[in-house]
Amino acid sequence: MGCVQCKDKEATKLTEERDGSLNQSSGFRYGTDPTPQHYPSFGVTSIPNYNNFHAAGGQGLTVFGGVSSSSHTGTLRTRGGTGVTLFVALYDYEARTEDDLSFHKGEKFQILNSSEGDWWEARSLTTGETGYIPSNYVAPVDSIQAEEWYFGKLGRKDAERQLLSFGNPRGTFLIRESETTKGAYSLSIRDWDDMKGDHVKHYKIRKLDNGGYYITTRAQFETLQQLVQHYSERAAGLCCRLVVPCHKGMPRLTDLSVKTKDVWEIPRESLQLIKRLGNGQFGEVWMGTWNGNTKVAIKTLKPGTMSPESFLEEAQIMKKLKHDKLVQLYAVVSEEPIYIVTEYMNKGSLLDFLKDGEGRALKLPNLVDMAAQVAAGMAYIERMNYIHRDLRSANILVGNGLICKIADFGLARLIEDNEYTARQGAKFPIKWTAPEAALYGRFTIKSDVWSFGILLTELVTKGRVPYPGMNNREVLEQVERGYRMPCPQDCPISLHELMIHCWKKDPEERPTFEYLQGFLEDYFTATEPQYQPGENL
C-alpha cells in the first residue's frame, strides 16, 4: 500500500551505520540534527515552522475576518482565499487558570497569537471559546507531528528507554528525526529474541530528492504515513512488523501558566502544602498544589538559610535552564520563609529510591542508564556554563519509568549557614566534594565531575555512604594524599576506571560531561551496530 516503486530484483542489505557509537579517545557523542523544512506562506503575520512548532514563538498570528473552516484539508479559508492552518489537540488538557482553555484530544483550533512562546492564544472550533493553550499539546492538522507514532527530536537512547518501558509488546515502534542526517528520520522498533531478550532496533528512513521516503530503495513511499502502513501489514525485511505506536506520555510544561511564564513570583496563598516528603538540614520538601489544581513539589527553606535577594537573583538564571533531565523550576515565594516550586517527581530522591524503594532490585544496566541520564542533564549544565556545586544522589529525583532529573542546581552557593560555608563544617558534603573545592573554594564544572564519580559509587552500592568507615576529616586528608575508593563489589572494572578518571587530581584531566554521557549511554552497546541493515531489504 502506498508503494511508489517496488523493484523485483532482490534488494541488497542496508549498510550498517555506527551513528553515535562510542569513541573514547575523542569523547565524541552525536548531537541533534535539526531538519529545517519550508512551508508556503499562508498570508498571516507568522505561522510556526511545523517541524519545530513546539519551540515556535516570538511573532504574533494575525487572522483575518470572515473565516470558514475545512476539516478535511486542515485549513481555514479567509475572504481573500488565503489558508490558515488548523491545529489539533494531541492530548486532553484541563485549564489551570481563567486564561487557559480546557480541551480534549482531537479538538481543533485556530491559532490567534503565538507570541507567548510556549503558550498560544487559540480559538476552539468545537466550543468557540478563546484562551491560551500549551503549544506542545497541539500539532498542525494532517501533519506528521499529529501522528501517534511521531516523536520528533527524540534521541536514540531516549527512544530505547520509552520503547522498553514495561507493558510494550514486540513491534511497538516510533519514528523520530535523524540525529545525523538532515531530512531523514529513524524508525525504532521494540524486538525480542532468545539471545538478547527485549531490545530495540533502529532503521534509517531516507528521503528521496522528489520528496518520497524509503528504508530500502526497493520500496519507496510518497509519505511517512504510507511507509508506516506498509510495514504495519508485513515485516518485509524489518525485525518484525509494526504493531502499535509507542505511548508518548504527557508533555512537560515549563511554566505553571501563561501568567507565571514571566511573572513567576507567586503569592504564598496560591500554594497548599499537602504531604511532607522529606526533611533536610535547611528545610523541608512537600508535595502540594498550586491554585488547588496543579500538583507541584514545594521546597521550604528555614529562615536565614540564604538571602532572599541573592536567591531571587540566582532563581532568574535557574528559571532559564530548561532540559528534560533537570527538575523544572516553576515559581518562587521570595519572602522568608522562601518557597521553591518545581515539578513533582513521584518516586522521591535517588538516594531513598536506592536504599528503601524499588531501586534495591535494580540490575547494572538500569543503574548505568540512570547514571547516563544524570550525565545528560549535567552535559546541558556544562554547555550552559553553569555549575551545580552539590551533585549527589540526594539531589537527583526519580519519576516513573526510572526517569532521573537533577534538582537543587546552583543553590549551594547561596547557603549562609556557618556550618556549611566553612566547607569543612558538619553540614558540608565533604565526601562528594572535589579537594580543590573543599580546600580552596574552587567550584567549577570539573569539581561537579568529581562529584559525579562519587555519585556513581552510590548507584552501584545502592546508596551506601561514600568512604565507609571514614569521617570527613579523614576523607579530606586521605584524598589529598592520593587515596581513591577501591572498586565496589560487583562493579565492572571499566566502570571503576571511569570513576578514577573523574577523580583525577588535576581538574583539567577529568572528562567532560559530554564524554561521560556518551560513554554511559553506549556502555552496553558500543560493540554493536546501532542501525540495522535489515533482512532481505
From Swiss-Prot:
GO cellular component, one term: postsynaptic density
Domain Protein kinase: 271-524
Record-listed Phosphotyrosine modification sites: Y185, Y420, Y531
Post-translational modification: Autophosphorylated at Tyr-420. Phosphorylation on the C-terminal tail at Tyr-531 by CSK maintains the enzyme in an inactive state. PTPRC/CD45 dephosphorylates Tyr-531 leading to activation. Ultraviolet B (UVB) strongly increase phosphorylation at Thr-12 and kinase activity, and promotes translocation from the cytoplasm to the nucleus. Dephosphorylation at Tyr-420 by PTPN2 negatively regulates T-cell receptor signaling. Phosphorylated at tyrosine residues, which can be enhanced by NTN1. Palmitoylated. Palmitoylation at Cys-3 and Cys-6, probably by ZDHHC21, regulates subcellular location.
Ranges where the SH3 domain occurs: 82-143
EC numbers: 2.7.10.2
Cysteines engaged in disulfide bonds, as pairs: none
UniProt modified residues of type Phosphothreonine: T12
Record-level Gene Ontology MF annotations: alpha-tubulin binding; ATP binding; disordered domain specific binding; ephrin receptor binding; G protein-coupled receptor binding; growth factor receptor binding; identical protein binding; metal ion binding
Positions of N-myristoyl glycine lipidation: G2
Subcellular location: Cytoplasm; Nucleus; Cell membrane; Perikaryon
Classification via InterPro entries: Fyn/Yrk_SH2, Fyn/Yrk_SH3, Kinase-like_dom_sf, Non-receptor_tyrosine_kinases, Prot_kinase_dom, Protein_kinase_ATP_BS, Ser-Thr/Tyr_kinase_cat_dom, SH2
Keyword Plastid: no
Enzyme active site: D390 (proton acceptor)
Family annotation (PANTHER family): TYROSINE-PROTEIN KINASE
Function: Non-receptor tyrosine-protein kinase that plays a role in many biological processes including regulation of cell growth and survival, cell adhesion, integrin-mediated signaling, cytoskeletal remodeling, cell motility, immune response and axon guidance. Inactive FYN is phosphorylated on its C-terminal tail within the catalytic domain. Following activation by PKA, the protein subsequently associates with PTK2/FAK1, allowing PTK2/FAK1 phosphorylation, activation and targeting to focal adhesions.
Self-association and partners: Interacts (via its SH3 domain) with PIK3R1 and PRMT8. Interacts with FYB1, PAG1, and SH2D1A. Interacts with CD79A (tyrosine-phosphorylated form); the interaction increases FYN activity. Interacts (via SH2 domain) with CSF1R (tyrosine phosphorylated). Interacts with TOM1L1 (phosphorylated form). Interacts with KDR (tyrosine phosphorylated). Interacts (via SH3 domain) with KLHL2 (via N-terminus). Interacts with SH2D1A and SLAMF1. Interacts with ITCH; the interaction phosphorylates ITCH and negatively regulates its activity. Interacts with FASLG. Interacts with RUNX3. Interacts with KIT.
Protein name: Tyrosine-protein kinase Fyn
GN (gene name): FYN
